[in-house]
Amino acid sequence: MRRLREYLRERLELRLRILRLLRVAGLRLVGGALAFQLFAGLAPVAFILATSSVVGRVPTAVEAGLDSPQWQSLQNALLLAGALFVLQQLSWPFQWAAGELVTWRVDDAVRERVAAASFEPVGVGALEDQQTLDELAEIADPQRGLGLSPGTACAGMLSLVSRYLQWLVASVFIGVVYAWWAALAVALGALAVRVGIRSGVGRLGAFEESFGPTRRRRDYYRDLLTSHDAAKEVRIFGLLPWLQDRYLARGLDAVQPVWRARRRIVYLPYALSTPVWLLLSGLTTIGVARAAAGGGITLGELAFTLQGIVLVSSFGSFFFESDWQTEHGMRAFGALERFESRAASERARESGAEDAATRPRFGIRFENVTFGYGDGARPVLRGLDLEIPAGRSLAVVGLNGAGKTTLVKLLARLYEPQSGRITVDGIDVREFPAAAWRRRLGAIFQDFVHYELPVRENVGFGAPSLLGDDARIHSALTRAGALDLVEQLPQRLDTILSREYEDGAELSGGQWQRVAIARALMAVEGGAGVLVLDEPTANLDVRAEAAFFESFLELTRGLTTILISHRFSTVRRADRIVVLDEGAIIEQGTHEELLRLGGRYAELFHFQASRFATGEEPE
C-alpha cells in the first residue's frame, strides 16, 4: 500500500511539473485552449438537455397543432439543439488548432532545454553513458508514435478538462433529473473502468520504456539505411538486405513483447472492471425504465437520463486524444528532468575560477595520469607523466591505439583523469572554467566535423567571435593552403560544403583537411595559445604531410603546439618527440636523439622509411 501511495504521489507531482510547462505556451493561448475545452465539456450536456426538451415537447405540440404556442416552443427547442450541434462541429477545428499550438510551443521550449542540458557537462563522457542515451532517446524518439512528447502531454492534459467536465456535469444532472443513487452508480461504474484502463496504460508505458537500448539499435540500422555517409559502402557491399532484416528484427524485438504484454497489462484490468460498470449501468437503466413506465418521470426526463447514462459511461474508455500522449509525454519529460539533473551534477563539479586568458606561460604537465573509457575498462593511459613547455612544439607518436588521441581529450577536458592530474603553470586544469580553458585551445581531431554549412562557418567556428571577420578567415585559409580552393567554389566563402544544397560543393578528404586546419589556425586568430593537430592530415600522402608539418611549425612558431601522428617521419622538425606505447611514454627526445638511442622510435622510423622507399605507404 505504501508503494502504491508513493507511486500515485510521484505521478501527481510529475503531472503538476509538466503542467507548469504551459507557461511557455503563453497565457492567451492556454486560456483560449482551456475555453475551447470547457465548451467541449459543457456543449454535449447542453445538447442532451436540448434534445430531451424536444422529445418532451413532442406529444403536447402534436396534440395542440401547428399554429399553437406548444408547436412554436417545440421548434425553438429544435433550433437550439441544432445550433448546439453546429457549434460543437465548428469549434472542433479551433480546439484542435489550439492544442497543436500548445504542443509546438511547449516542445520548442523542451528542445531548448535538451540543448542547454547537453552542453551542461564539462566533458562528453556523460553523453556517451547508456543511461543518458536512453533518456535522450526517450525524450525524442521518432518511432514511438505520432509525436508523443511533453508538448502533446500538455495538450492531452488540457483535453482531459472536457472529459472530466462531461462526466461530472452529466452525473449531477442525472441526480437532479432522476435520482442521486443512479447518478452515483453510473459515475462510479464509469470511473472504475477508467481507472483500470489508465493504470494499464501507465504500466504498459513503464514496460515499453525498458526496451530503450533495443530501439536505439533499431534506429541505428534505420540511419545506416538512409544516411548519405553510409550509402556508398552499403551499396557496394550489398548490405541493404542485411540491414533491412536487422532493422525489421530489432523493430519487432521492441514491439512484440509490448503487444504480448498489452493483453495482460491493459486488457485484464479492463475485463475486470467492465462487469462492475455493466452491472451498475444496467441496474440504473432498469430503474429508469420502471420509473418511466410507472409515471414517475416524464418523457423528456426519460430521454435525458438515458442519454446522460450513455455520456457518463463514455468516460470509462480509452481517450485517444490524451492517454498515450500523456503517458509517453510524461515519461519523456521525466527523462528530460533526469537528464538535466545528471547534467547539472556534472556541471557542479566545476568550481574553478582561475583566469585562463594568458595560459600557459610556463608549461603543461601530465602528472601520473591514468584513464580508461568506462568503469572497469582497461586503462588507455597508465601513470602518464609528460611535460609540455610553453611556446615549444611537441610531437606525440605511436601506433594506433597507443592513447595519443585520449591524451588530447584529457587536455581539452572532454574527459577527466581517473587518477593523477593535469596542470597548467602549476595550477590544476580543473581550477580553470572549462569554457575559458578551451578558448585557449585550438584542437582539430582526426574525425573533425564536416559541417554542412558555408565555408565561412566551417573555418570561423575555430573562433566564433570572429565569424564576421572575413579578413582573418582569408588569412587562416591562406596559411592552411586552402584559399585557392575556396576561390574556385561557386559562392566562395558562402558556398555550403555539401552537394545536398543548391550551389553547394563536395570536398575531397584532403580538401576537407585543409579547411579543418584553417579552422584550427582561426582559433589562434581568436586567442588560442595551445594548438593541437590530431592526425588531421592522415588523408595526405607522406610527402605532403611532412611538408605541411614543416610549414605548420614555421607558421606557429612561438605557440605551444602538439602534433599527433602515427607516421614517425613526418614530425622530425618538432622541438621534442615522445613515443607513446600502450598508454605510457617509453621514449622522448629530439629526432636525432631518438635515432641515436636506437630504441622503439628508431626501429619504427626505419621500418616506415623502408616501406616508403619500396613504394609502400607507411602505416
Predicted ranges, named:
Residues 31-94, 164, 168-201, 279-300:
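Transmembrane helix-loop-helix hairpins at lipid-water interfaces of multipass membrane proteins
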Residues 412:
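Helix-to-loop junction immediately C-terminal to a conserved catalytic motif
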Residues 1-44, 63-77, 95, 131-169, ...:
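Membrane-integrated ABC transporters
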Residues 421-423, 456-502, 558:
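ABC ATPase nucleotide-binding domain helical subdomain, centered on the C-loop/LSGGQ "ABC signature"
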Residues 136, 379, 483-515, 521-536, ...:
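ABC-fold ATPase nucleotide-binding domain signature/coupling loops
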Residues 550, 558, 567-619:
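C-terminal portion of ABC ATPase nucleotide-binding domains
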Residues 23-27, 140-153, 213, 226, ...:
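An intracellular "coupling" helix at the cytosolic face of ABC transporter transmembrane type-1 domains
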